[in-house]
Amino acid sequence: TKVSLKQKLDIKKNEIYIFNKNLNDLIKENIILKSKKNKYFLNTNLDLYLGKFIQNPKGYGFVDELFIPPRNINTALDGDIVAVRIRQENDTIEGEIISILKRNTNTIVGTYIQKKGDKFGFVIADSERIISDIYIPNGNSLNAKSYDKVIVQIQRYAEGTKKMVGKVIEVLGFKNEIGVDYLSVINEYKINNKFSAKTKNQIEKIPDKIKDSELKNRKDLTDMCIFTIDGIDSKDLDDAISIEKITKNQYRLGVHIADVSHYVKEDSPLDKEAFNRGTSVYLIDKVIPMLPKKLSNNLCSLNPLETRLSLSVFMNINSNGTVTKYEICESYISSKSKLYYENVNKYFDNLEELKVDETIKETEMEEKIKQSLSYAKELSLILKKKRQKRGALDFQLDECKIKLNEYDKPISVEVNERGISNKIIEEFMIVTNEVVAEHFNNLKIPFVYRIHESPKEEKLSTFLNFIKNLGYEMPVNFSPKTLQSILDDIKGKPEEATVSLILLQAMQQAKYYQDELGHFGLATTYYSHFTSPIRRYPDLQIHRIIKDYLNKNLSSVKLERYKKKVVNTAVVSSKKERLAQKAEEDYERIKKCEFMEDKIGQKFTGVITSISKTNIKVLLPNTVEGIIYIKANDQEGNYKILQENCSVENPLGKRYVVGDNIEVKLKNVSVDEKIILFELV
């Protein structure tokens, strides 16, 4: 029906007119058929396909796996919902976009250009997936100057040879001004960095202190040796831990998570805003929080020596890593110290004294924390060994750490070292998420799960061919365990980072879902996100469900409501997570380019991470990646591909293989295009 079509395509009120027009046009063209009962069907006789168009920066695109050459795009933009006619010529199958059902883009962030003497201008989009520029007629520029970053509202989409026409609705500032790149990124990905008046009003009404009445029916854990371990700049402390050894072969692990749902009531202005944000966004030294700071950095944050409301999971875990008993309960805690990853790692390596809160220094509690850390290290290694045994994938990929000065310019780019304390918290959060997911899956209660489906056959085949070309044996059977054995084989070898990266690219993206379908990467049947409700909405949503279950408040009416809520939460939160990841990656790429700008002409040693007919990608030890342009296997080509995606030969007969360490010289940097260009030495 028309109603179900609108729901499926997520048609907003301001899109109804164009939706109706497009639908009527498709009916006239006999592409969509309308029945007497006002139901709509795709004309199956026309070999048509409906889907989302994904634009490649090189000009071509895809609708799902169907290739769309540049000549057949028909003015579609990245993300548009389109109707495609499938064509087959000889052995080639490709698509032609014949109609655009729903436009995905109505505003574009980019750089305004106006040539001297012209009364009009145009905007070059920041997104590499918006290939054509936007024409800005006289009077539509909002007084923007050349090289200003602007937000453009599309007034007319491209038709035939006519360009898109737009109107500047906001000038963000000159492109090199402090903070303009940040504003460009958050506007590009529609990330809201301001809270509504209704939300602010609700926050102001929340008391600054916890009342005694709020502690009723909760376990008092304030005397326990509970502490947090976080990054030195972290202010939103979601999780705290406690641990003791109850027998020679048995640990009792407590994971205590901020009770955000106590403050964020369902369907309140605060809840609606958190739902729409979906996640906190971390742009190097800037945080766009899911929740206002009064909650994220104060009332909900498990700050030391402050009474905080929490949800606790206690687990008895034996020396094999098996959870033999567990309890989920509402609680309140008082963290005894805020520890930092960097310091705890050095403490384990006997390089520094443990830095605890001054109030417990040289007390019995300090000794308890040190003993707890010793137990935590033991248990984390047990849990990791168990995960590895079942085949959980451990990608050997470095994360970067970028430091900015007061002018937002990068002063260092380096590998973010992860030590034993990082791995302790990671293992403890994983086992907690597994326990919670399995418990509520067994209860058959509506829930939000974190799922990771197995790789699609085509992408996995590409990866397996790649490792075969590198000389590794192809596995006979396919499972997480066999893939992890490949990662184990390459550990410490030059191609380690590359193989990990290509395997990661072969994986499907993890997402939120209302049914438990397992987590391929972790090789586990049950998984959820429970441990970060300050910064992730799915965690907040399942906290509500858990608390209603614990308090026996799950009426049939509420269960029905939750059934719908978890579906909506999973869809929207997955989408918001992708946008946040893209924004974080984009901002990181910009800052890496800025860091390299003043190093043109300098030489570097890096590792080859990929080879194609057009370029060789090179990764430097500090995680900066650049490309070397080449031409291979065509009439003008002076390079020869020896093995697809693996090796290439230059005109002098020198071979370059993925994983090789090579010396390169920095040739050029384009911050606007986010490209770092090397040349071979």
What are these model-predicted stretches?
Residues 7, 146, 156-158, 184-191, ...:
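Electropositive polyanion-binding surfaces
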